[in-house]
């Protein structure tokens, strides 16, 4: 009886050793480490992983490898989105160009450029409002248009005045800073523009009676003054304007 038990035990031990020797080369994937063989792909047999070392991997559940089909610049395939997460689209760039940037890497603000010019300033260094600049430009343009239309008035250079209009206190013996001869038949004619404290002397050489015309002086927002000859009957007037700067 004891001999039978020993024989059966010996058979069990031998069978167990045989099982261990046959499974010595099997390495479950859970125990894979850096010293174990890496799975390889066999395109001829579609046997994606080595069954000798990784028998617990099911080849039937492995997706087929996306092949290049002869195209250049390999296709990297699509990336799957993990469950429970939403994929966010990448930002679209217009025309394939990056937004304009300064040398420091900061985005340049949009808008119109100033062409490198500084805003106009007053003699004290203060910036003038746009309305003042527009008023000055209009006055200068109007003066230029009037001067272009002036005929040759040199014959009136030494002609005496019939009567005189003045603004402020004008010293008749003082030499004027500016002097010119004019001719007009407009209802309103700009004689001169200047500072708010400038004085003017207007000599009428040829024209209507003094009661038919008058002078008026206005000051713009920027502080400039404008001397206007009021001629409601539109009579032809020839005169001389003298400007005395303050």
Curated annotation (Swiss-Prot):
Give the GO terms filed under biological process for this record: immune system process
**Spans traversing the lipid bilayer:** none
Q: Which portions of the chain have biased composition (kind: Polar residues)?
A: 79-124
Extent of Basic and acidic residues compositional bias: 65-78, 141-155
Q: What are the subcellular locations of this protein? A: Secreted
Report, as the record phrases it, the tissue specificity of this protein. Answer: Salivary gland (at protein level).
Q: Which residues belong to the signal peptide in this entry?
A: 1-23
* Residue ranges, annotated region (Disordered): 51-160
Chief location category: secreted
Gene Ontology cellular component terms for the protein in this record: extracellular region
Top-rank lineage group of the source organism: Eukaryota
The record's keywords, sorted A to Z, are: Immunity, Secreted, Signal
Q: What does this protein do?
A: Down-regulates the expression of CD86 and HLA-DR on the surface of lipopolysaccharide (LPS)-stimulated human peripheral blood mononuclear cells (PBMCs). Reduces LPS-induced secretion of IL-1beta/IL1B in human PBMCs. Reduces LPS-induced secretion of various cytokines, such as IL-1beta, TNF-alpha/TNF, MCP-1/CCL2, IL6, IL27 and IL-1alpha/IL1A, in host cultured macrophages probably via inhibition of NF-kappa-B signaling pathway. Reduces production of IFN-gamma/IFNG, IL4 and IL6 in human lymphocytes activated with PMA/ionomycin.
Note on file? Answer: Immunogenic; triggers antibody response to Phlebotomus papatasi bites in humans. Immunization of mice with the protein results in the development of antibodies specific for mouse DSG1 and DSG3. Exposure of people to Phlebotomus papatasi bites results in the development of antibodies specific for human DSG1 and DSG3 the titers of which are correlated with those of anti-PpSP32 antibodies. Interaction of the protein with human DSG1 and DSG3 may trigger the production of specific anti-DSG1 and -DSG3 autoantibodies and promote the development of pemphigus vulgaris, an autoimmune bullous dermatosis.
Relate the assembly described in the record.
Interacts with human DSG1. Interacts with human DSG3.
Protein's name in the database: Salivary antigen SP32
According to its UniProt entry, this protein's organism is Phlebotomus papatasi
């Amino acid at each position: 009886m004891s001999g039978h038990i020993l024989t059966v035990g010996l058979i069990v031990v031998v069978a167990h050793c045989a099982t261990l020797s046959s499974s010595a080369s099997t390495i479950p994937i859970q125990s894979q480490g850096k010293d174990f063989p890496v799975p390889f792909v066999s395109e001829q047999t579609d046997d994606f992983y080595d069954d000798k070392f990784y028998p617990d991997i099911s080849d039937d559940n492995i997706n087929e490898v996306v092949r290049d089909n002869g195209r250049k610049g390999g296709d990297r395939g699509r990336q799957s989105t993990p469950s429970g997460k939403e994929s966010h689209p990448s930002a679209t760039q217009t025309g394939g160009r990056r937004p304009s940037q300064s040398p420091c890497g900061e985005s340049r603000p949009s808008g119109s450029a100033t062409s490198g010019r500084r805003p106009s300033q007053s003699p004290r260094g203060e910036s003038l409002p746009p309305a003042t600049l527009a008023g000055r430009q209009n006055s200068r343009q109007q003066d230029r248009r009037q001067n272009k239309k002036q005929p040759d008035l040199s014959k009136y250079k030494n002609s005496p005045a019939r009567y005189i209009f003045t603004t402020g206190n004008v010293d008749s013996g003082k030499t004027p800073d500016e002097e010119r001869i004019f001719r007009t038949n407009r209802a309103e004619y700009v004689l001169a523009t200047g500072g708010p404290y400038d004085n003017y002397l207007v000599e009428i050489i040829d024209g209507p009676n003094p009661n038919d015309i008058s002078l008026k002086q206005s000051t713009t927002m920027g502080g400039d003054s404008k001397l206007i000859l009021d001629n409601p009957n539109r009579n032809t007037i020839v005169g001389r304007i003298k400007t005395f700067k303050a």
